[in-house]
């Protein structure tokens, strides 16, 4: 289950209803998928063949199509990151820069962990959203944020897009301190 840490205040928000309410107040969609649907051989596996990626997409076909229908997503894929990922450090450097997108950034975590650092409203400032398997998040179009891995340095996620070109980040020049 996702955990939120507000950087300015140190406040920690836990529990699905509390997390959903806080994220909703910040314009961020949060849902939770039943991760027990995932076949055992794909749980906690971070190096995936194309066939295994397709199996994950097929497992969550109904959830993906429902989310796509509600929010206008047209294409989806799987991203898998771990220490076995070629050029992982370069990818993380790219992901860890504060940026925006011209569409929502949607991730449904199917294994592992990740953190979105999201700019909230003026009063809230930046907050971390620690995600684990089953958590689904959609950072709104134009909202400054970045993503990184947690200490275990491994995640598998379904990504949904409106634009077929996929993940396209636009740098965001931050005027406030991200870490406080």
Swiss-Prot record:
Its EC number is 1.13.11.54, 1.13.11.53. Pfam families: ARD. Fe(2+) binds at residues 99, 101, 105, 145. Its cofactor is Fe(2+); Ni(2+). Keywords: Amino-acid biosynthesis, Dioxygenase, Iron, Metal-binding, Methionine biosynthesis, Nickel, Oxidoreductase. It catalyses: 1,2-dihydroxy-5-(methylsulfanyl)pent-1-en-3-one + O2 = 3-(methylsulfanyl)propanoate + CO + formate + 2 H(+); 1,2-dihydroxy-5-(methylsulfanyl)pent-1-en-3-one + O2 = 4-methylsulfanyl-2-oxobutanoate + formate + 2 H(+). InterPro entries: ARD, ARD_bac, RmlC-like_jellyroll, RmlC_Cupin_sf. GO terms for molecular function: acireductone dioxygenase (Ni2+-requiring) activity; acireductone dioxygenase [iron(II)-requiring] activity; iron ion binding; nickel cation binding. Signal peptide: none annotated. Coiled coil: none annotated. GO terms for biological process: L-methionine salvage from methylthioadenosine; L-methionine salvage from S-adenosylmethionine. Ni(2+) binds at residues 99, 101, 105, 145. Binds 1 Fe(2+) cation per monomer. HAMAP family: Salvage_MtnD. Monomer. Catalyzes 2 different reactions between oxygen and the acireductone 1,2-dihydroxy-3-keto-5-methylthiopentene (DHK-MTPene) depending upon the metal bound in the active site. Fe-containing acireductone dioxygenase (Fe-ARD) produces formate and 2-keto-4-methylthiobutyrate (KMTB), the alpha-ketoacid precursor of methionine in the methionine recycle pathway. Ni-containing acireductone dioxygenase (Ni-ARD) produces methylthiopropionate, carbon monoxide and formate, and does not lie on the methionine recycle pathway. Belongs to the acireductone dioxygenase (ARD) family. This is Acireductone dioxygenase. The lineage of its organism: Bacteria, Bacillati, Bacillota, Bacilli, Bacillales.
């Amino acid at each position: 289950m996702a955990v939120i840490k507000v950087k300015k205040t140190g406040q920690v928000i836990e529990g699905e209803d509390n997390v959903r309410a806080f994220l909703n107040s910040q314009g961020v969609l949060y849902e939770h998928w039943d991760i027990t649907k995932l076949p055992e051989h794909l749980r906690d596996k971070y190096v995936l063949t194309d066939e295994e990626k397709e199996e994950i997409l097929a497992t969550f076909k109904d959830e993906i199509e429902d989310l796509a229908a509600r929010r206008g997503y047209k294409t989806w894929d799987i991203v898998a990151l771990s220490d076995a990922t070629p050029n992982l450090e370069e990818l993380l450097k790219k992901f860890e820069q504060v940026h925006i997108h011209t569409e929502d950034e949607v991730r449904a975590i199917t294994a592992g962990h990740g953190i979105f650092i999201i700019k909230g409203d003026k009063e809230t400032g930046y907050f971390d959203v620690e995600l684990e398997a089953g958590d689904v998040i959609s950072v709104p179009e134009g909202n400054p944020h970045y993503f990184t891995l947690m200490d275990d340095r491994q995640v598998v996620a379904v990504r949904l897009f409106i634009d077929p070109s996929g993940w396209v980040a636009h740098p965001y020049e931050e005027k406030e301190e991200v870490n406080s």
